[in-house]
Amino acid sequence: MEERFLQMEERRLQRDLEAEERRIQLEQRRFELERDHDFRMFNVFAQMLSILRQGNQGSSVTGVAPNVDLNQAFSNATEIGERMSEEAKALHLGQTRSDRIASVHGSCYRADFQSSPYLSVRGNSASIVWTSSEEGYEVYHADKYDEDKNPSGIINLGTSENKLCFDLMSKKLTQSSMNLIEPSLLQYPDWKGHLFVREEVARFLTYYSKAAAPLKAENVILLNGCGSLFSALAMVLCDPDEAFLIATPFYGGISRNVSLCGNVKLVYAYLDSQVTGSCTRPFQLTVDKLKKALQDAQSEGVKVRGLILLNPQNPLGDIYSLSELQDYLEFAKRHELHVIVDEIYMLSVFDDSATFHSVLEMDRLPDPQRTHVIWGVSKDFAASGIRFGTLYTLNQDVIKGVASFGYLHGICGPMQYKIAQLLRDRDWINQVYLRANHERLKAAHTFVTDELKTLGVPFLNRSAGFFIWIDFRKYLRKGTFEEEMILWRRFLEKKVLLSPGNSFECNEPGWFRIIFADKIHRLRLGMQRICEVLEEQEHEILNEDKDQLCQSESEATVDSTDEVIFVSHHQEPTSSGSSTLGDLIGLLQQQMRSSDWLQKNTVGQFAQEKPEVYDVFSKLVGKQ
């Protein structure tokens, strides 16, 4: 029976591989057509530019060389574009070229990638995804910081790992009661996981998620990590080129998890930092934003099969309230969307002022057959090297589909036993581990946020997870992702690794994620290196601003009614009549960081030179 199953599985996988290879070949051909189109269009316009230059030299009246038909040139360019476009459309693969749809070759593509003759098209595609996501980490792994062996190495504040509780976990996991070898643990298990482990997981989640009713082991599946669960759910819930809806910024590994094997896309509901009347916090997720993203995707012919929620949210650290969760789930039900809720940081809420609410806590789920909850030990138990992920769902069809991946992504028997013993010891978890872990997380978080406050760097002050979402936009020369990557590389050159906002699909350049769940001495050194980069960057920007200001003052005289109030580089300049106190303070903070500003500038001098600005400033101060 087992041999027949393996043969059937092998044939199915072979069919899938062949279909995937054909799809990737067609996709590559489409990319080649688009590239050829760009080259041809460039060629045409280069010829047109040459013609115009000849015309300027030969005719001072018309500026166009005689006997040259520009209309014909434009017509030829249009025909080439239309012809190439039609050929590309003939190879349409259910993909639309939109920045809302993340494809395998989208944000993950590296221009310097060299395809391998030893790999298939699909293999090269997987390599592109892998190498691009590992950029920076390759450098880090070759030059890791070590207090004794390599003190000048790179400090990793980019990988979301808890490095504060190794002492507690190593002591616990090496206890004699944690180690058992018996025949059943060395044999093939139920692909969903050993029953005794699933029972323990059900009891654990019932207690810590404050489930409305006892959870059942029959609804639990175990795979080797939450990444494997995302990959399996993508394969089970979506066909190739279909999509999940997710709010940005989000943990970028999900893109790879759903696309690498399943070729499933992500549709982005972009969140922004602006606080409006309908929002109470930066980057707040609303049903309206989900609805707009869904409608935009549907208008482009993309079939969205589910919604992914991260709670607590990575990288923001937000915790959704029960009412917010209810709204999101009801939205999904109206549109018949599955909901995957990632609660991997469930026990990493380290401040009593914040309260986590699990989806499992809800008395009645709007659509229980389409609601699936993920959790694992890697974050909450500071054990990212232990690959143990759990899925809880009431949908038995999903259970069967995901369970088939246990053959490829199962967890070894001895490790299942060890984790069951860990989850069973509730006294140790509550009285020893969680108490110490939360104290250490809070202390580390306080250290980093105090440093950021000293630097005058804005950030989201949250009490969940291992990360802080930091606003470095004022340190960008321009509000572009190219400038963001330049700043990211400057951090790396200074031997500190951070995660740029672009890797989380953030819509606003200049945001970074920093991991604080580390020892204080490493955090201190890492923050020193960050501070050095920011000071150098700010000094260079200020010098450039001074040069530009001197040049603009010498070239033109500006009417006082249109005078620009200087604000942070990431903000739009506003007229003096609509400036805010925050804008003016931003100006003062930037200027005062230069060493001689206070000596060269006085209140009286400022009032005399810029009376309109000084008047606005005085009125605003009087209102505070």
Task: Set out the residue ranges of the language-model regions.
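Hydrophobic residues in well-ordered beta-strands that form the structural core
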Residues: 246, 268, 341, 419, ...
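Amphipathic alpha-helical coiled-coil/zipper oligomerization segments
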Residues: 1-103
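Helix C-cap/helix->beta junction micro-motif
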Residues: 334-335, 455, 494, 537
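Conserved PLP-binding active-site segment of the aspartate aminotransferase-like
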Residues: 393-394, 469-479, 495-531, 550-555, ...
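N-terminal small-domain helix-loop-helix segment of the aminotransferase-like
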Residues: 105-225, 276, 280, 285-289, ...
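Conserved core segment of the aminotransferase class I/II
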Residues: 105-119, 297, 361-442, 446-458, ...
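Conserved core of the PLP fold type I
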Residues: 178-334, 346-366, 372, 528-529, ...
